[in-house]
């Protein structure tokens, strides 16, 4: 059967199924480019490692750029992957629970598949040849050292004889949130250290000094959910270094009311903390915490708070600048689901910790600033050169007076909260189909400034690439979603993300596996200057011939075209290879439609962020008018749908897009409307000349309502009937008669009744009817 004839017969059904929903206006939060799992693989932008058994059960990921290795901790195994290759030679070491641990775990009521295994949750660098690894050990945590060799060697070995108890260094459960970092040969962890998951603490172990832990007082930690831990120096004095913990707490209502609320915190301890001599023995004597606020200001002073901390990324600066903390938050409200990204300067965090302490007289009282005398040395400070005074040396926290230790025990909370830069989030996402789980940031130098590119991992296996424009007269940050990348084939939550600026690569981890993803692929945006400029990707610029990687030190400076802030190709791309686009926009596709029938004109812009507009030039008119839509003429996301075509709809249609003030033509159609009377006459004449048959009598019984029959037949359950109806009544006959679907009026995608040159074919068809081959007999 002629493909054009089949497309004509089944067009109406596909229209009803696929284009019946009106198109909403473009949203600034819609990704400008969406790339599927297949797209990423076919363009070599990503590579996937699923392990030898098809699924990793990944728990932790450690990127070691010194050794050019990526280390993975999973269920009962560890892996080493080389960064300079597409995972061709992975190394695996099995690490099963100790004998009897799994049996005991099952006996205690835990799940043998999802809990009673050794889930590796800690991978930290110990020295130049070894990593410290800790696993859940079937609810009996264990730790050991892993030999990884020197730089250039691809070695991965586990010494089973060195396995030791990991309690306090690794949680019992594979799903329990926790954070860890390795500083000076010691492991700092924030976790719940008991079997039942109730004993929350911050723990230090593994070095020559005695282990240190949080006091059991509930005022320190209330059901914490640890997210991240890192050593952050306050100044050049190494004795003043601190380890910062980022976490959320569920605490009693701060105003003394009933119920509990979730609050995000930043806490810190001194690296040289040794505990107290008589008070807080073997306990933290420098622990302080402050609230992290991420909220959107509203009318009347009301604020919408994002209180659940999801992930934290530290953006280390160049010399002379302050460290910036990017934090991803979510709402805890049952009313709506929202996410926000707030940015904090470390200098602002330091100011809060140097400010007033919080105090209240009782559980039913509100918090206020402490107004009494603060002892010396100031509670929470590290013993260092800054605290030493003549005649009163404090070389260790054990030398601190008891009143200092008692004060820090009673007042661990700071009164002032830490507020984000500019007082509001740089990015807010609400009513998403997926949850945001991970965040990493890359600071990129572009032609018109420096931009922070934010990569957000979701719980559906995709990564959003976003920039937030600030300043330049903007009262609020402008969100620009550059790409949505479907990294994994099936939906799976992204639980780990690491970025290599040196390799311009993002490493994405999920329970399914690990993906290596290039940060950019500029040629994907298109082959024209306007398309490259409209992408607004700081990584990419038009170099005069193609959309290519922007390099600040490139010698082709005068040829580069890039406008991240405004995305205006009208200025940037003047005379830069737009002739090809103009030639394409001048092409006119001829489309035929039948009066009172449905017809569809397809227009698919490259950018979902562009506003689509349709213009009509009627026969005899010199100017064009914008198409007015109503119940009969509907503009959808795929094009323009005429539900019931009229003779007045004939004319030249132009589909244009408008994006950042730049308009361009996508496609043009010349729509010709065939009168219903003319088509009815054709069917009536054919039915009289045909041999009698059941299908022939059906066609001639109601020649004026044939299109209504097709509409009634459309539907998934009736597709075989549509096929048979088209085949026997119309499609095969038309395909065999005089090549009436051949010629210059060819069927375009989604166009009905293309190629019916009725005026030219009518006479020849009538003269040749007596020589026509019967429909049910093949020609010889």
Curated annotation (Swiss-Prot):
Cystine pairings recorded for this chain: 105-116, 134-143, 270-382, 294-342, 522-540, 603-655
Keywords: Disulfide bond, Glycoprotein, Immunoglobulin domain, Secreted, Signal
Known glycosylation sites: 44, 127, 652
Pfam hit, one: ig
Domain Ig-like C2-type as annotated: residue spans: 569-671
UniProt domain Sema: residue ranges: 32-519
SMART domains linked: PSI, Sema
UniProt function note: Has chemorepulsive activities for sympathetic axons. Ligand of NRP2.
Protein name per the record: Semaphorin-3G
Taxonomic placement: Eukaryota, Metazoa, Chordata, Craniata, Vertebrata
């Amino acid at each position: 059967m002629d493909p054009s004839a089949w497309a004509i017969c089944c067009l109406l059904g596909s229209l009803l199924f696929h284009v019946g929903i009106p198109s909403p206006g473009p949203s600034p939060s819609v990704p400008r480019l969406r790339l599927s799992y297949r797209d990423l693989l076919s363009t070599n932008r990503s590579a996937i490692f699923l392990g030898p058994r098809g699924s990793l059960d990944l728990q932790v990921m450690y990127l070691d750029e010194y050794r050019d290795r990526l280390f993975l901790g999973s269920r009962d195994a560890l892996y080493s992957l080389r960064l300079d290759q597409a995972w061709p030679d992975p190394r695996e070491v099995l690490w099963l629970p100790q004998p009897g641990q799994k049996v005991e775990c099952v006996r205690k009521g835990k799940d043998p598949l999802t809990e009673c295994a050794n889930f590796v949750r800690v991978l930290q660098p110990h020295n130049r040849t070894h990593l410290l690894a800790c696993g859940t050990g079937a609810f009996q945590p264990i730790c050991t050292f892993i030999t990884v060799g020197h730089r250039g060697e691809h070695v991965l070995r586990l010494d089973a004889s060195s396995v030791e108890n990991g309690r306090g260094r690794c949680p019992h459960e594979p799903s329990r949130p926790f954070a860890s970092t390795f500083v000076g040969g010691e492991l700092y962890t924030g976790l719940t250290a008991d079997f039942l998951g109730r004993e929350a603490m911050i723990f230090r172990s593994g070095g020559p000094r005695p282990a240190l832990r949080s006091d059991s007082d509930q005022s320190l930690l209330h059901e914490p959910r640890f997210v991240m831990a890192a050593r952050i120096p306050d100044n050049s004095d190494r004795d003043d270094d601190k380890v910062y913990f980022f976490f959320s707490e569920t605490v009693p209502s701060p105003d003394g009311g009933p119920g509990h609320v979730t609050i995000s915190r930043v806490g810190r301890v001194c690296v040289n903390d040794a505990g107290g001599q008589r008070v807080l023995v073997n306990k933290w004597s420098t622990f302080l915490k402050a609230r992290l606020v991420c909220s959107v200001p509203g009318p009347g002073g009301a604020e919408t708070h994002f209180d659940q901390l999801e992930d934290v990324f530290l953006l280390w600066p160049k010399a002379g600048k302050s460290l910036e903390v990017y934090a991803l938050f979510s709402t805890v409200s049952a009313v709506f689901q929202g996410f926000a990204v707030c940015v904090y300067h470390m200098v602002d965090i330091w100011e809060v910790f140097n400010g007033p302490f919080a105090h209240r007289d009782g559980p039913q009282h509100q918090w206020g600033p402490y107004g009494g005398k603060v002892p010396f040395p100031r509670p929470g400070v590290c013993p260092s050169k800054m605290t030493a005074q003549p005649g009163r040396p404090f070389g260790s926290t054990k030398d601190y007076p008891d009143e200092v230790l008692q004060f820090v025990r009673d007042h661990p909370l700071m009164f002032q909260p830490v507020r984000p830069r500019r007082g509001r989030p740089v990015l807010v996402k609400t009513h998403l189909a997926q949850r945001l789980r991970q965040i990493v940031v890359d600071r990129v130098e572009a032609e018109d400034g420096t931009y922070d590119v934010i990569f957000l991992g979701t719980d559906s296996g995709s990564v959003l690439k976003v920039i937030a424009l600030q300043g330049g007269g903007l009262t609020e940050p402008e969100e620009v979603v550059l790409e949505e990348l479907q990294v994994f084939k099936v939906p799976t939550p992204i639980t780990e993300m690491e970025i290599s600026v040196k390799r311009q690569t993002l490493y994405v981890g999920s329970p399914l596996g690990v993906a290596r993803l290039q940060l950019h692929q500029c040629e994907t945006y298109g082959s024209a200057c306007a398309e490259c400029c409209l992408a607004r990707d700081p990584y990419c610029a038009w170099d005069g011939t193609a959309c290519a990687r922007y390099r600040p030190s490139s010698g082709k400076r005068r040829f580069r075209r890039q406008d991240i802030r405004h995305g205006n190709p009208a200025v940037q791309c003047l005379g830069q290879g737009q002739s090809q686009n103009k030639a394409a926009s001048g092409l006119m596709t001829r489309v035929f439609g039948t009066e009172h029938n449905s017809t569809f004109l397809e227009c698919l812009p490259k950018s979902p962020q562009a506003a689509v507009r349709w213009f009509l030039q009627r026969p005899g008119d010199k100017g064009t008018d914008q198409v007015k839509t109503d119940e009969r003429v509907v503009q959808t996301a795929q094009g323009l749908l005429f539900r019931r075509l009229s003779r007045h709809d004939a004319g030249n249609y132009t589909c244009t897009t408008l994006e950042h003030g730049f308009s361009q033509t996508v496609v043009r159609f010349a729509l010709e409307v065939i009168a219903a009377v003319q088509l009815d006459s054709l069917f009536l004449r054919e039915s009289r000349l045909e041999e009698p048959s059941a299908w022939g009598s059906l066609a001639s019984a109601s020649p004026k309502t044939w299109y209504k029959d097709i509409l009634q037949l459309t539907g998934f359950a009736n597709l075989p009937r549509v096929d048979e109806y088209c085949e026997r009544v119309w499609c095969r006959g038309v395909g065999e008669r005089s090549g009436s679907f051949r010629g210059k009026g060819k069927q375009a995608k989604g166009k009905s009744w293309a190629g019916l040159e009725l005026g030219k074919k009518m006479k020849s068809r009538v003269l040749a009817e007596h020589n026509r081959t019967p429909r049910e007999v093949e020609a010889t």
